[in-house]
């Protein structure tokens, strides 16, 4: 799948601890190598009430993604207590 990054995702990534950042890098690589969301062996859940928005769980952090066809847009990465205030 094609992977894109929002400016807010890159900005959020600077504030994430190093060990979580390493796990996120592996997740991004796995997304690039997969053909669909179903191929990913990640903790992905659809955001209720939104058609194309999902979250990926990484420890106490959540990655907010948008899926359009074969493109994944990484929108936000925030702590679990604040992700749903800013995403989607």
Swiss-Prot record:
The enzyme's E.C. designation: 3.1.-.-
The keyword Membrane is annotated on this UniProt entry: no
Root EC class: hydrolase
Protein name according to UniProt: Toxin RelE3
Consequence of substituting residue 62 to K/S: Inactivates toxin
UniProt keyword Nuclease present: yes
Domain of life: Archaea
GO MF: nuclease activity
SUPFAM superfamilies: RelE-like (SSF143011)
Keyword list, A-Z: Hydrolase, Nuclease, Toxin-antitoxin system
Family stated for the protein in its record: Belongs to the RelE toxin family.
Oligomer status and interactors: Forms heterodimers with RelB3 and possibly a heterotetramer RelE3-RelB3(2)-RelE3 from 2 heterodimers. The heterotetramer is probably not very stable in solution.
Matches recorded under InterPro entries: RelE/ParE_toxin, RelE/ParE_toxin_dom_sf, TA_system_RelE_toxin
Function: Toxic component of a type II toxin-antitoxin (TA) system. Has RNase activity. Is very toxic upon expression in E.coli. Its toxic activity is probably neutralized by the cognate antitoxin RelB3.
Gene name as annotated: relE3
One Pfam family per UniProt: ParE_toxin
């Amino acid at each position: 799948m094609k992977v894109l990054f929002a400016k807010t995702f890159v900005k959020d990534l600077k504030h994430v601890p190093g060990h979580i950042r390493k796990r996120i890098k592996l997740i991004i690589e796995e997304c690039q190598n997969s053909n669909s969301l179903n191929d990913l062996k990640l903790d992905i859940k659809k955001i209720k009430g939104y058609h194309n928005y999902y979250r990926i769980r990484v420890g106490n952090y959540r990655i907010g993604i948008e899926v359009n066809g074969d493109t994944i847009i990484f929108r936000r990465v925030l702590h679990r207590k604040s992700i749903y205030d800013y995403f989607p």
